[in-house]
Amino acid sequence: LFHARGHGVSPGADSRKPETKSVAQALRPYRELVFIESPGTVDGGDVLVLGKNIYVGLSTGSNQSAIDQMNAKLGKYGYHTQGVEMHDCLHLKTAVTKVDDKTLLINRKWVDVENFEGYELIDVDASEPFGANCLPVGDAIIFPVAFPKTSAKLAAHGYKIKSVVVDELAKAEGAVTCCSLIIEN
């Protein structure tokens, strides 16, 4: 499921498919909804929206059929969707997330930087490979306490950090964006 702002899911895992009904119900008052049809699947953790560009990690939960449908259905809103190959990670947002409109936090070992030309890149600390998942909200970056070296890099770039404990989410390679759905005005 996707709406005109490029958020939502049609998950690849059968166990997650029932979630789409409640998410659609919650989003319907705020956005026009469009749906990804089978055989297309897309997990929210694979979707990175950067302005009018939507990057989808090609994973076990997201496929080319969904990317093609997203281009067809979201193109009328000015969005372009492209697939991104990943290496050794579950989802795209395990490897790269948006810090602000011009800056990304990235683990270069898990995703090719050529996909993100034109953005300033802040590298995770080499000892914190899972530290690339952050969530900008307002004037702050919500960021896991488990990655203090990467947090210090963000702070050195002038970002205000709001630290959170996500140890239980991390056990399933989850992070701050996994439990968040930000609806912009």
Write out the residue ranges for each language-model feature.
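The feature marks the mature, well-folded catalytic cores of soluble enzymes
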Residues: 1-185
